[in-house]
Amino acid sequence: MNKEIIAKRYALALFQIATEKQLLDQLEEEIRAVWQVFAENDKFLSLLTYPKLSLEKKKALIKETFAAVSSPLRNTLLLLLERHRIDIVPQLAEQFIHLVNEARGVAEATAYSARPLTEEEKRALSDVFAKKMGKTTLHIENIVDPSLIGGVKLRIGNRIYDGSISGKLERIQRQLIG
């Protein structure tokens, strides 16, 4: 079975538990931290999937590493470990955050700009484009890309809004050639 499908099922179960116990904000913060641990430490995942290390030692490692996280998340990680699915943690985190964002009416967006955007500029982008997407707000991550020359390129889901100078130059070039 596809990792994305499996991760979505676990994420949905964790989301339901978080909603019932009113731990949504806390679990979102914790799952982002867990995701970061797995993303930044390839050897950690290798250790958890190492066949010669006993399951009990792997469980102890999870309990020790994630002692500060709430029990629903820690128990989910232990369950994934027991079922040999610990490698889906990044996908599970992504799916969980997507579910939380959908429930809140928030969309994740990436803004590419020639210089870092101020909080006011991010807020203005969020206000304008959230309405276009039918959301209440956008959570914007800013990536500086000097090749854009100026302006902003905004990616929301699978949509790209290109208001960069380099994008405009490319469109003009296509019109002149074609």
Curated annotation (Swiss-Prot):
Answer yes or no on keyword Cell membrane.
yes
> InterPro entries annotated for this entry?
ATP_synth_OSCP/delta_N_sf (IPR026015), ATPase_OSCP/d_CS (IPR020781), ATPase_OSCP/dsu (IPR000711)
- Give the membrane topology: Peripheral membrane protein
Subcellular location, record wording: Cell membrane
Instruction: List keywords of the entry alphabetically.
Output: ATP synthesis, Cell membrane, CF(1), Hydrogen ion transport, Ion transport, Membrane, Transport
Sorted alphabetically, the Gene Ontology cellular component annotations on this record are: plasma membrane; proton-transporting ATP synthase complex
Record's superkingdom? Answer: Bacteria
| One Pfam family it belongs to | OSCP
GO MF: proton-transporting ATP synthase activity, rotational mechanism
HAMAP family associated with the record: ATP_synth_delta_bact
Q: Which family does it belong to?
A: Belongs to the ATPase delta chain family.
Q: How does it assemble?
A: F-type ATPases have 2 components, F(1) - the catalytic core - and F(0) - the membrane proton channel. F(1) has five subunits: alpha(3), beta(3), gamma(1), delta(1), epsilon(1). F(0) has three main subunits: a(1), b(2) and c(10-14). The alpha and beta chains form an alternating ring which encloses part of the gamma chain. F(1) is attached to F(0) by a central stalk formed by the gamma and epsilon chains, while a peripheral stalk is formed by the delta and b chains.
Q: What does this protein do?
A: F(1)F(0) ATP synthase produces ATP from ADP in the presence of a proton or sodium gradient. F-type ATPases consist of two structural domains, F(1) containing the extramembraneous catalytic core and F(0) containing the membrane proton channel, linked together by a central stalk and a peripheral stalk. During catalysis, ATP synthesis in the catalytic domain of F(1) is coupled via a rotary mechanism of the central stalk subunits to proton translocation. This protein is part of the stalk that links CF(0) to CF(1). It either transmits conformational changes from CF(0) to CF(1) or is implicated in proton conduction.
Report the protein name in the record: ATP synthase subunit delta
Q: Which organism is it from?
A: Geobacillus sp. (strain WCH70)
